[in-house]
From Swiss-Prot:
The keyword Flavoprotein does not apply. Pathway: Amino-acid degradation; L-phenylalanine degradation; acetoacetate and fumarate from L-phenylalanine: step 4/6. InterPro entries: HgmA_C, HgmA_N, Homogentis_dOase, Homogentis_dOase_bac, RmlC-like_jellyroll, RmlC_Cupin_sf. Belongs to the homogentisate dioxygenase family. It is an enzyme of class 1 (oxidoreductase). The keyword Iron applies. GO terms for biological process: L-phenylalanine catabolic process; tyrosine catabolic process. Hexamer; dimer of trimers. This is Homogentisate 1,2-dioxygenase. Homogentisate binds at residues 362, 383. Keywords: Dioxygenase, Iron, Metal-binding, Oxidoreductase, Phenylalanine catabolism, Tyrosine catabolism. Its EC number is 1.13.11.5.
Length: 450
């Protein structure tokens, strides 16, 4: 039986509920007037006959500045579903990155991949995932997994959540209409979405197909970096992060709830939509951000600064100044440094770098690194501009600024080794000739000429 639906799952048009502005604010939102209890969290009887449910993303005793939780007022508690059963034969998702059949020895080679092909069969967002690499352990709540997705079907009568970590979703092709328990996010390429650990959601594809990247953060929640001497403004500004208003549906039927726990998928029958949160308040909620709003910082004298100036979000580790995960972007920007090699320089790094490309061309690679593709440069693997880029950048007139336009690249940088999965090392998308882009770098050394 289907009753009045406030929010439809067909996603035939963009959402209308709108957004609240700010990063990790104490939000308060209700889809029915008076649905939020006044001056208390768990009244004896919640308004409209709703259930009060606390949704915790951190320990109860986490310091107040880091404590994340929300109170949800919903038609049924999240506990109302049938028992979960393991989805058999499901091994395309990895959550433990020690040596195993799924994670072979990690080569020190530079690695690069072409985009995943679009599926030949109807495939939704969840079934379109495949794990490319990662580190740490979902069970230990440390590290991350990096997935790619390619899908051509909206999720129908099916809902999903990950208990393993929060999901940083980077669309490359195709819009995503993401319905969550706490409201709706409409996300397009050049935007990102973050779905907190445990939030139930479904994804519709208004353009019929979609492809992109997911960084699943097992550890400390993503946060905005400190700005230090940059000052009180810059990089990703808090006001540009958008969190949905409450919106709900009261819908009954034969549905499937899919849970991801320790890298395995589990399914349960559920007889109602979990998108039944009529009101909520708190600071643990999904959000989106438009990367085109990033306030890019750069040198206006000489040298190319470290890529930490492009940091959007970070997951901190237990070592001050060393992040578990950095999400960095390389957006359109002006380059004005004089007598300077302007592209990213040659580099070896104690951290490990997984890169993707949303749009255009990355300024350190003239060809081969294409939108939807990926690269991995692990700890102490040498990398940098290819031969063509080096020759061009070594001879341009640096008395004049130039604009790097029509681009959007990004990087997931981690403190620990990023281990590619067996799928990533065996797939036909792996570019066996990637190393050749540096073989054309010529010897210019002449001890007789400075």
């Amino acid at each position: 039986m289907e009753r009045t639906t406030i929010m439809t799952l067909d996603f035939s048009k963009p959402g209308e509920a709108g957004y609240q502005s700010g990063f990790a604010n104490e939000f308060a939102t209700e889809a029915l007037p008076g649905a939020l209890p006044h001056a208390r969290n768990s009244p004896q009887r919640a308004p409209y006959g709703l259930y009060a449910e606390q949704f915790s993303g951190t320990a109860f005793t986490a310091p107040r500045g880091h404590n994340r939780r929300s109170w949800l007022y919903r038609i049924r508690p999240a506990a109302v579903h049938r028992p979960f059963e393991l989805v058999s034969g499901e091994r395309r998702i990895v959550a433990e990155f020690g040596d195993s059949d799924d994670v072979p020895p990690t080569p020190p080679n530079q690695l690069r991949w072409d985009p995943l092909p679009m599926p030949a069969q109807p495939t939704d967002f969840v079934d379109g995932w495949v794990t490319m690499a990662g580190n740490g352990s979902a069970a230990a709540m440390s590290g991350c997994a990096i997935h790619l997705y390619a899908a051509n079907r909206s999720m129908r009568e099916r809902f999903f959540y990950s208990a393993d970590g929060e999901l940083l979703i980077v669309p490359q092709e195709g819009r995503l209409f993401i319905m969550t328990e706490l409201g709706r996010l409409d996300v397009e390429p050049f935007e990102i979405a973050v779905i907190p650990r445990g939030v139930r959601f479904a994804v519709a594809l208004p353009d019929g197909r979609a492809r992109g990247y997911v960084c699943e953060n097992f550890g400390a929640l993503l946060r905005l970096p400190d700005l230090g001497p940059i000052g009180s403004n810059g990089l990703a500004n808090p006001r540009d992060f958008l969190t949905p208003h409450a919106s709900y549906e009261d819908r009954e039927g034969a549905f499937e709830l899919v849970a991801k726990l320790n890298g395995r998928l589990w399914r349960a029958d559920i007889d109602h939509s979990p998108f039944d949160v009529v009101a909520w308040h708190g600071n643990y909620a999904p959000y989106k951000y438009d990367l085109r709003h990033f306030n890019t910082i750069g040198s206006i004298s000489y040298d190319h600064p470290d890529p930490s100036i492009f940091l959007v979000l970070q997951s901190q580790s237990d070592t001050p100044g060393v992040d578990a995960i950095d999400f960095v972007i390389f957006p359109p920007r002006w380059l004005a440094a004089e007598d300077t090699f302007r592209p990213p320089w040659f580099h070896r790094n104690v951290a490990s770098e997984f890169m993707g490309l949303v749009h255009g061309v990355y300024d350190a690679k003239a060809e081969g690194f294409v939108p939807g593709g990926a690269s991995l440069h692990n700890c102490m693997s040498g990398h940098g501009p290819d031969a063509d880029t080096f020759e061009k950048a070594s001879s341009i007139d640096t008395s004049k600024p130039n604009k790097v336009g029509d681009t959007m690249a990004f990087m997931f940088e981690t403190r620990t080794l990023i281990r590619p999965t067996r799928f990533a090392l065996d797939t036909a998308q792996l570019q066996a000739n990637y190393f050749e882009c540096w073989q054309g770098l010529k010897k210019h050394f002449n001890p007789e000429q400075r």
